[in-house]
Amino acid sequence: MVKIMSINLTAKDKMKKLAEIPVLYSDASLKKCLDLMTEKSLGITCFTDRAGKLVGLLTDGDLRRLLLNKQSPLPALLVSDGLSFGNSNPKVGHADDQISDLQNLMNEKQIWDLPIVDSSGVLLGLLHRHDANQ
């Protein structure tokens, strides 16, 4: 059996929807961030403002660096403390971007998870490298 792949797949065809990814406001606790990463089985959390606009992201590696540098108890740390170790201006894709273009961007920039936003910067979902390649 031959599998026919569409060459017109876009981010919206492959991205994880908001309900499937860790999303918090930037005033959340780091513990909540870690709990949500664990619950959603992803090594990234996206942060939005109250209007849903993407304001940054933290990876599990960013959190590790934060904990090692701050030497503060976990309950005392907020996500806003961690954004200096994370990315407050992440690369993003858009729902109608071609998967092949986003794969090239992810490969070039060595990105595993790419936030997908609308034209106003509102977070719509997340494209995981494995999902893009399937």
Show where each model-derived region lies.
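A structural micro-motif recognizing beta-strand termini
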Residues: 25-28, 95-97
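Proline-centered helix-kink/hinge sites
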Residues: 46, 90, 115-116
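Tandem CBS (Bateman) regulatory domains
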Residues: 2-20, 55-111, 123-134
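Acidic (E/D-rich), amphipathic helical modules within compact regulatory domains
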Residues: 32-69
